[in-house]
Each structure stands twice: as C-alpha cells, then as structure tokens.
Amino acid sequence: MSSSVLSKKRKVSGPDSSLDSSWSPTYSVMFGVPPGPTNEMSKNKEMDIDESLYSRQLYVLGHEAMKHLQASSVLISGLQGLGVEIAKNIILGGVKAVTLHDQGIAQWADLSSQFCLREEDIGKNRAEISQPRLAELNSYVPVFAYTGPLIEEFLSGFQVVVLTNTPLEYQLQVGEFCHSHGIKLVVADTRGLVGQLFCDFGEEMILTDSNGEQPLSAMVSMITKENPGIVTCLEDSRHGFESGDFISFTEVQGMSELNGIGPIEIKVLGPYTFSICDTSSFSEYIRGGIVSQVKVPRKINFKPLLASLAEPEFVVTDFAKCCHPAQLHIGFQALHQFCTQHSRPPRPHNEEDAEELVTLAQSVNAQALPAVQQDCLDIDLIRKLAYVAAGDLAPMNAFFGGLAAQEVMKACSGKFMPIRQWLYFDALECLPEHRVAFMEDKCLPHQNRYDGQVAVFGSDLQEKLGKQKYFLVGAGAIGCELLKNFAMIGLGCGEDGEITVTDMDTIEKSNLNRQFLFRPWDITKLKSETAAAAVRDINPHIRIFSHQNRVGPETEHVYDDDFFQKLDGVANALDNVDARLYVDRRCVYYRKPLLESGTLGTKGNVQVVVPFLTESYSSSQDPPEKSIPICTLKNFPNAIEHTVQWARDEFEGLFKQSAENVNQYLTDPKFMERTLQLAGTQPLEVLEAIHCSLVLQRPQTWADCVTWAYQHWHTQYSHNIQQLLHNFPPAQLTSSGALFWSGPKRCPHPLTFDINNPLHLDYVMAAANLFAQTYGLGGSQDCAVVAKLLQSLPVPKFAPKSGIRIHVSEQELQSTSATTIDDSHLEELKTALPTPDKLLGFKMYPIDFEKDDDSNFHMDFIVAASNLRAENYGISPADRHKSKLIAGKIIPAIATTTSAIVGLVCLELYKVVQGHQQLESYKNSFINLALPLFSFSAPLAPECHQYYDQEWTLWDRFDVQGLQPSGEEMTLKQFLDYFKTEHKLEVIMLSQGVSMLYSVFMPASKLKERLDQPMTEIVSCVSKQKLGHHVKSLVFELCCNSDSGDDIEVPYVRYIIR
C-alpha cells in the first residue's frame, strides 16, 4: 500500500456485500484519518499474568512469550467461520487486544461454521454481532468491532494483521504495506475441503525458541583435553542433543574453565558423546559436571506476499500428497481470478465452472516462473477444488483456525518456528469414495444454516448427519470443541438424532483458557450441563442430553447393551489412558466407530477406529513413562523433578495416608488383621505412623502444630542428612576405589534453620497449617506470631544412630522388603496403641492434594519442601509455576492445538457417517504446531489370525445363544459340546474377566459339580456377584485345542442370556 502502488486517497472495494458470502465480504482499503478503536486500545496497560487462568497455556508458551502476547494488538479482517475461529483462539490466548473487521452481513451459509451467529442475526454485520460474544471469552482482552474502511494509520496500530477469505488483490495491497512497516501478516483461506495459509513476519524476526521443548541436560563422565574436546556423558541415558545445538557447563571439577563460559556449539558424535571447543589449554578434567542445552535466539526472514507468490516455499502437510501444495498454489490463484470475473465462486459440483477453473489454472501455470510451473497440471485436483470452493465447513475452519492462531502467537512472541511461508491442506478424501453422478441440485442453497456444508456434500449427507446418535465421553477442552463442531455440522440435530455427553467434573477457572463453551460465571457448575446448554444456544436444533457419570464398569447399568446398540458412534475426549482403553473395549464389543484424539501442548493426535476395517486404540500403546527409582527419591536425588516428587510423597504420607489409616483403625474392626497381613515391613510402618498420630505427635493447640512442623523440618533437612553422611561420609570410596558420592549421587549437606530465611518460615507455616487441618484445629497465616513461637523453641539435637541401613540400589531395597520384621516390636506397638473405644468420636481429616487453590497451603508446602531438599543436594530450585507442573502432573494445553485436532477429528467423522470402506480414505494424524510438523497416515488394518481355514480379527467373536428353545439355559457341558460339534474346538480353559469357570485341570469333584450347572449360575458362584438385570450378555475367553491337539488362538465368546 505504498504510494507507488496505490495513491493516498484511492479506495479499492471488493464485491457488493449482497453477493454470495462464500466469495467474500466487502473490502475497502483507504488512507486518511485513523478510526476510533486504535485510541481505545492504547488504554490497555501491560498487566500481570493471571496464572490461575493461563496456567496450562503458560506451560506451553512460558512467561516471556506470554508477556509478548499481552503486548500485541491483532486485527482480524473477515468474520466468517475461519475468522471467528482465529479470533476465538487468540482471545483465549490472551493478546493485548483484538479488532474484528468485516463490512459484510451475515447470510444463511455463514451459520454452517460461524458459531457466533444466530438465525436471527441474518442481515446484520458479522463483526458487530460477533464482538460481544467473543469479548466474553477473556475479560483481559478488549475486543473491538470495526466496519469501516482500512486506512494506513489504523493498520499501523497493530502488531499482527490477519486476513481471512479475502481477494488476492486485497491481500497483495495489505501485504505490501505490512511488510514495509514491520507488521506481521497472516493470510488464511478455506474453500470447502481445501485450505491455504501464508505467513510474512518480516525480514528480521527474532526466533527465541524453535521447538518449545524443555532444554536438555546430561551428567558428564569425561572431557578430553584436545582440539576439539570430546565430552562423554553417563551411560544411564542418551544426551539427546543434535549437532548445531548450543550448550553450557556447570559443576565441572578440574576443567573448571568450562564452567560459566558462553554457549558452545557442539557436534554430536554418538548417543553419549559430542565434541566442543578447543580444550587443549584447559586444566585436566577430574570429575562431575552437568551439561545443559541453551536456546540461542536467531534471526529468520520472510519474503513479502508478492515475491513469495512467485517463488513459494511450502510446508508439506501430507507426504502422500506431496505434489498437492504446488498444484493448489496454482489452483488458488486461478480461483481468485474466477471469483473476480464472476463475483462468486464456482457453483457447487458444476461441470461448466469446473472446466473454466481448469482453463484458468492452465493459464496461470503457463505464466508462472519455472520454479513454480507444473509440468503436468493435476486436472482432477483442480476440478475438485472447483466442486467444493463454494462450501464453508466448520471442521476445516477449526483446523485452519488453530493453525493460523498459533502463527499469530508465533508472530507476537518469537516462540516456535513459523510456517515458511505457504501451507496447503486438503481433505478431498471426505468426498464420496465412488464418484457417482453428484446431482448439482442436491448442493444448491436452501436458505438454511447448513448451506455451506450442503454445497460440498449435498443434502442427503446432511439428512444422514441429523439422524446420527453419538456418545461423547468428556466435556473438557476437546469435548467443548467437538460439541461446537457437532452443532455446526448438524450432527444429531434431526428428529431421530441425539448426542449424549457425560463428564463428572465441574468447571474451574483454569478451564476457561481453552474450554471455550464456559464463562467465568459458570465456575463450579457441571461441565456436561453447561456445555450442552452452550451448544443449544449455538444451534437450537441439536438434540443433546447431558450426564455426570464416569464411564467404567461401575456405570455399565447406565451405558448398557440398549444404550450402545442404538449408537452410530463414540467420540473420546478423555485425559487418561485407562479410560480410553475401557471405552475402546466397549466400542470393539459393540462394533461401533470410535473417534479418538488427544493433545499435549502444541502436539496432538487423531485416531479413527472403524469396525472390521481398522485396528482399535488398544492394538498399539505408547511405552510406559519412566518412573523415578525409590532409592533416588529417598536418598540420592539429582534433579528438581526428584525433589518435587519427594515433596509430593511427603504430602501424601503426612497429611492424607496417616489420617486415613487412623480413621480406619478407629472404625474398622478388621483393619488390624489386614495390616498385619501386609508384606515386608509395611505392618510396622503403618502401626508406627498411627502411634505417632494418636500418641507421640497428637497436637492439642496451634502452638503444638508449629512445634511439630519445626521439629519435622530438622528431621528432614538436618538430622536425616547428617545420618546419611554418617553412613556414607563425603570421602567414602566404593569397593572399586571410586568416590561413592560421584556421578548421579550428589553429596548433600545439612541445613541450619534460620528464622529470617523466607523459605524456612514458609515451610513451617504450610506444614503447621496442614497438620492442624488434619486434626480439625484452627491454623494461622500470621507470620509474626509463628516467628515468635519459633524463637522460644530449642534446636533439636542430632545423635547418629547405629544399625541404620540406607539402601543404595533398588536391588538392596527389594531384598530388604522380603525380610521378616521384629515381631516383639510389632507387639509392643499394638499394646501401645489406644484402643478405639477410648477415642470414641475422635477422627482425623485427610487432605486431598489440590494444586490450583493458592490459598490452601498445598503448593506452599510442596514448593518449600522441594526447594529445601534441593538446597540439601545443591540442585537448582524451581519456582511455584514449575513445581505445580511436576507435582500436579499437569498436561500443558493451548486452545490452538485443540481447535486444529478437533477439526481433523470431524473430517474423519464425515467419512464414518458416509460409510467409507477403503482403508486409505481414512487418516490418522499427528501434528506439532511448534515445529511445525504434520504427519498423516492411513490406519492400520486389524491383525489377522486363523484357526483351521477361518480367518478372524479383534472384531470377530463367537455369538452363542445361552437360552435354549425350551427356555432353559445352556449348561457348561452343553457349552463345551457346542464348540466341539459346531467348531471342532476342544475348550481346555474358560474364563470370564478374572474368574476361572472351567479348566481341564480342575479337580474331578468340582468339574462334575459344574458340568450340569447353567453358565450364569457358575459365573455368579465363582465371582460371588449376582448378575444385574441390565446384563444381557457375557464375555467369555477361551483356550482351545484343535482336533489334532494343537493349541490355537480363537476369538472371544459373546454369550447371550437375554
């Protein structure tokens, strides 16, 4: 928009706003006096970060990037479905301010994906209608609506400008101005099942962190004195570095020159070795050292839109379609020409318009530079682009809205690698697998809310979507996005359709940052009810029912055969593997499609499970997380993760487990009997803890609680450390002559209590208050009172104990756990405990750890306890934010990833509802928006097994009718005979769940007794549980021999009893 391209007073207008909204709103570019919103935005001062709101996002972006976000104003031009998705995500993300620009009015087709519009809003300005609804998402982000022309001074007030679904001429003009004035530009466009994204972040963008991963660190075992020096790390884990990484050293003994020098670039030589700078003039290496990765900022540059259009760089999203980006780059330019000539997009599935677009694409291709020109234009791809270009799909907008919003955040913060510079994505496999005569009249608009979707798929699929019955498990971040998309596409919105959503959780403040159906006034309300009400507001036709049940064995009377058999599919929105596995098993049993997805920060994945066609979720699993050895936690920590986990275990032992044991001892007559049957030293440990709680340490006053906390501080941070050093002095050598305190074992030192040290006082305050709470006593937050009490307390004396065994390995620990305990000491403890009848009415109050309440002392205790132990061992402390992440096992989350992932889920939903039967039509996906990385692959087919000539997969089973025509139930003998005669299988073992019902190795008397018993009677007898009235069938597992006596693997049995 420099004067060389456009005069200062010239105005460029797009098509009239009364035209088809799938083309564009009215666009104006004008230079002159800036409008009002810029002045209002200047009032938005820099504010502190609300960690209770942004906590999950902060674990993705970090505080520094978040501060940059809060200093950035963003303009979004174009408020159709894609624009509103981007706006939603960046408002939730917490930028300084957002201005919504649109001169177009809401039309019926907009309701296919624009979730801020209602049917009564038709004919009103999109930006003005969207502004108050988007402003509710985040009270920290002012949201303005602007419907006038864009002018130079106005654009100059923004750090980032986003253009959505805009004409190419308009993009070029705005792009030139933004590039020349240092304003970051994002251009996004979706056309039915095809989308485009472009980024221009200027010529000198500073990238502070390309991947967002936590800096790696490793322990050093050797550094050579040569050029270049070779560093070898301890062989307990790979260092994980890459050539070109920068690192720094600390705690190196001998070659101390390396400590504290600037970041050193490395070259990786192997999984445990890498080379550094010239170390030949340094001192000899003796021992120790920690090497840590350093994120070094670097500059990256971008071409302006015009130059990049001619010589594009592409981010490939699907390597099965690696030729598509260049083809679609030509196709989109042709599409812009078509729209300019006709003031509309190609008509849905119209052959005449498709032919014209192909001709235009051929012309564009012929004029393209050699680097872009395609030797062979993909005519079929260009035709499909024409067929769907008039469409507007909520899932595509959700996917591109997540990507574009993440690019906006990158532009604001310099965090994560931007898209350089073009990204194209298509989901054309969502169209019918067999190209039947797609009747154009089936895709024409009917002035209803699904017109944008009907333009792509036709009215028949719309009707089918309305009849679907789906079960959504979870109403958190993914659940909210799924429900929004379900409402937009019309899933379960017909007379015969329905959506059932269940979630037992209530809404917390930290949810509001990414679970966008919830508002501040919804805090403490049930998620499922609130989410259902919110999507009814988006689409009043949706038939949705909310439950508050956990999905598991205990609710199978609710989610029973009748419930599952009526479903068309299930969508998971869960946050733990066990629940996912359970739902997956149910879907396999009832042969229902499953849409599975998950996110972790900027990473996300989608898996589609289709009966008989794909493997199930349970067919493959990630390896289990590596746990911290107990000996490391108890005595030899070397990382802050170890001390935080130790503090977390302390919390459970001191304030929960002990109180629960006391209450069970006082109320359960069989508690003592069960405790004495525990393995190893557990009986002694449990009874000692109860004795302490009821006798030795039972407080009567607040002052007693302070005394206990003070004494416990000395036990943990002084006495226990002195005892450890008594057993293993600092200079102790191992049997091989090496220093005991070396490698991963850090030599600790005891602490001396200092009343003027805030960390020491924080520990006593938190521990004393929590201890008081477990006894129902009142606490105090008055530090002065606590300090005064502490001044009067004597310092506990330490005397080393002999005979104390400290385990230095897991093997030692396990061997000790198998040893017997001192029975006489156990009897003494049992005698010393007050009997329950002497403590009638007394009870303790166990505390459940809650990380997100900053007033309950829970995190105060964790932070203080962990950092004091870190000080013991010379480990760098962690702030409250990082400690909460580790202690609370928080899953980092951001709205952008959720939006993108759910968009991909719903693209798979289109295929499932249509009944696609080709495996390659479906796409499992993994994305990492930080890199950016996109990986799509066809699902795996289920593993095939065989017995005799019968092939089977996990989807197959034996269906056995348990009720005979006579009305009597099949006996065990009849069951065994059935498999012998009908399938030539000799059953040698039969089980149901964990219950063994039959085995050839059973005692003859038991076998004779069971053979004539009905199957359900045997199940009830063995499991000691009566079958509920909701149970209509049972699952049996078989071990069988063939007729030749060989072991063979066979499917499970569905035994039908009702």
Swiss-Prot record:
The reply to whether ATP-binding figures as a keyword in the UniProt entry is yes
Could you tell me in which tissues this protein is expressed? Expressed in testis in A spermatogonia and spermatids but not (or at very low levels) in pachytene spermatocytes. Also expressed in Y-bearing ovaries and at very low levels in adrenal gland.
Q: Where is this region: Disordered?
A: 1-22
Indicate which residues the UniProt annotation says bind ATP.
Answer: A477, D503, R514, K527, D575, N576
Tell me where on the tree of life, at the top rank, the source sits: Eukaryota
Question: SUPFAM superfamilies from the xrefs?
Answer: Activating enzymes of the ubiquitin-like proteins
Say yes or no: keyword Ligase present.
yes
Write out the pathway annotation from the protein's UniProt entry: Protein modification; protein ubiquitination
The cross-references to Pfam families, in alphabetical order and at most eight, read: E1_4HB, E1_FCCH, E1_UFD, ThiF, UBA_E1_SCCH
The residues annotated as the active site are: C631
InterPro entries from the entry? Answer: E1_4HB (IPR032420), E1_FCCH (IPR032418), E1_FCCH_sf (IPR042302), ThiF/MoeB/HesA (IPR045886), ThiF_NAD_FAD-bd (IPR000594), Ub-activating_enz_E1_C (IPR018965), Ub-E1_IAD_1 (IPR042449), UBA_E1_C_sf (IPR038252)
Record-listed E.C. numbers: 6.2.1.45
Keywords of the record, alphabetical order, are: ATP-binding, Ligase, Nucleotide-binding, Ubl conjugation pathway
Q: Please list the GO terms describing molecular function.
A: ATP binding; ubiquitin activating enzyme activity
Q: Which family does it belong to?
A: Belongs to the ubiquitin-activating E1 family.
Q: What else is known?
A: There are two active sites within the E1 molecule, allowing it to accommodate two ubiquitin moieties at a time, with a new ubiquitin forming an adenylate intermediate as the previous one is transferred to the thiol site.
> Oligomeric state and partners?
Monomer.
Give the function comment from the record.
Activates ubiquitin by first adenylating its C-terminal glycine residue with ATP, and thereafter linking this residue to the side chain of a cysteine residue in E1, yielding a ubiquitin-E1 thioester and free AMP. The Y chromosome form could be involved in the survival and proliferation of differentiating spermatogonia.
Q: What is this protein called?
A: Ubiquitin-like modifier-activating enzyme 1 Y
Q: Which gene encodes it?
A: Uba1y
